[in-house]
Amino acid sequence: MLRDKYGVDVNFKLVYPLAIREPEFFEGKNFFTYFWWKMIDMKLKARRLGLPFSLPPKPDPICQNTFTGEVLKDQPFIFDICHFLQAIEHDKQLDFAYEISRCIFGGTEDWHKDNNLIEVTNKLGLDFQSIKNKAAEKEEEIISQIKKNQKEQLEAGHHGVPLSVYKDKFFFGQDKFNDLVKELKKDGLNI
């Protein structure tokens, strides 16, 4: 909205999900004490925003035991999709993140399969095969970029996502988006 409607420069920076960056965060959290409430919250927010939302994702990008909180060692999906996204030209990364999130959490089965990724990249005018090749060929560079983004995220003051940073302030979560807009208005954004 801010970028497309008001010309705000959004510098999207991909980080690995918290379960990958800080698996210990989920120790002792389980379906009944944590995940159940998160799912209810996400479903309500999606409904309020008019977004498609279906749980669980098929497959879930993070392999995790929701009854114990344990993040599994084997992660067959999250690194591939993160590296694929990071291989996309920077000005299209946010668009891809938006579209693939709609697939993952909107009920698209096998969102990670090439045919679904091709559909998303085609929609955005991107070349699936060249992105896939770049993700494979430049994997170490991509991992370094993501780690740099994670370092900058922590330096901004928070480890969560979504995180917006403007000047010296961070805005964590969808609920803080309106606070970010207020700050932009103070600096002259005409909405």
Task: Describe the residue ranges of each PLM region.
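Structural alpha/beta surface segment adjacent to cysteine/selenocysteine redox centers
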Residues: M1-I104
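C-terminal cap of thioredoxin/glutaredoxin-like
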Residues: M1-V8, H90, D95-I191
